[in-house]
Amino acid sequence: MVDSLWFVLALVLLAVVSVALVLVLVLRREEAHCGRETRTEYLQPNYGQTGGFRVSSAPSNETIIPYRYWLIEGQVSEIDYDIVPGRRMSLRTAKQGQMLYPTDFFEFAFEDVQQYDIDGITVTQRQNAGRISSIFWVRDGYEYLLYSMQPEMNMIAGLAVPFVTNTRVEPAV
């Protein structure tokens, strides 16, 4: 009688642990897709060991000031910029087909979408008045996304040329 009681208790405990394990796995999978990004901060934009690439050149001067370097989900780099006077932008780079867009990037339909060439590169510019604006381009197997969540009027268009012509990503060696 005592042996069967222990057997039943062991089965109940096993069932509870199994249900808890399934719930943890399901919740963890949902958490990974809820918009939260795993970010690792770097001192410079060289993501060679983890991401397999480095940002070899990007704009940096008295009005375009990089201040933080990230690797997102081990595959997308992001450089945060202060744009004088008092604005912020971010530049994301990734191997072609691996770009991760910021949370809420496509939440609103873009009011204006244009394509144009800069230095032989096709650039897609998207913007909403007073909300998000971005430019996207592809060069040598890498994708580039320059965006601002709170842009100033025509800021993205004014910064497109220096970013498209001066930003390069290359494989890490």
Describe these PLM feature segments:
Residues 21-29:
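Juxtamembrane cytosolic interface motif at the C-terminal end of transmembrane helices
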Residues 140-173:
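Surface-exposed amphipathic alpha-helical segments
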Residues 30-134, 138-139:
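Short, solvent-exposed recognition patches
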Residues 1-12:
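Feature marks short, highly hydrophobic, charge-poor N-terminal signal-anchor/signal peptide-like helices
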Residues 11-21:
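Core hydrophobic alpha-helical transmembrane segments of single-pass membrane proteins
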